[in-house]
Amino acid sequence: MATWTKKDFDAAGVTEYPAGPALDQLRRNFGGSVVLALDVSGSMEGERIEKAVRGCRRFICEAVEANYSVGLILCDHGISGSVPVDYDPSAAYCLLAQAAIAGGTNIVPCLKLAHRMLLDARASDMVLAVFGDGDLGDPFEASRVAAKLTADGIRILTCGLGQSSAESLAIISTETSTTRVAETSTIADSIADMARGLRFLSR
């Protein structure tokens, strides 16, 4: 007599070729999503924005290679432009190519948009990475809104141009061991280096 019982096991189909609709679900379950926010306020003019765009492209490339879907926000005192989280970085690269400086500084609209974008992505690791050369705008409101992101399991990485900016942005960072500081000569490298904060990045 058989001593085993037949059971049904439901799981995402992983043997389809070409990949079927289960692929996106598997990526969400075992991968991550990151929104990269770039300050495009007026003080980012000249070589600052040029180097920042190069660094953002490198960050996005590393994130995609690590199985992260990527969204992008260009922010000043509001939202200059954005693309939703996706595993295809083409739209993010296209927006970066159009990045133009204007306006002042207020991180709050960026935080709110990134919050919605990341919750929609529903990944196992949700990250907001921010680069700027100024402050938060309204630090009290920024801290209040950032707390909502962290309550939903979203990690926040920040990098500022110069010590003053870095310390200001670090108020909303969930990293406790370091304050990421960029110099004008290292903007691209510093932005790209934030990818080290992605949990699933292989080094």
Label every model-predicted segment.
Residues 6-8, 99-104, 134-182, 192:
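VWA/integrin I-like adhesion module and closely mimicked acidic/polar interface patches used
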Residues 180-203:
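C-terminal "exit" segments of structured domains
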Residues 62-65, 121, 147-154:
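Arginine/glycine-rich "motif VI" loop of SF2 helicases in the C-terminal RecA-like domain
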Residues 1-35, 42-48, 203:
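Acidic, polar low-complexity linker/tail segments
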Residues 21, 55, 109-116, 141, ...:
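Well-ordered alpha-helical segments embedded in enzymatic catalytic cores
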Residues 45, 78-84, 137-140, 166-169, ...:
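Switch/connector loops and helix/strand junctions flanking conserved nucleotide-binding motifs
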Residues 68-98, 113, 117-119, 167-175:
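Short beta-strand-loop
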Residues 26-84, 110-111, 127-131, 159:
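Von Willebrand factor
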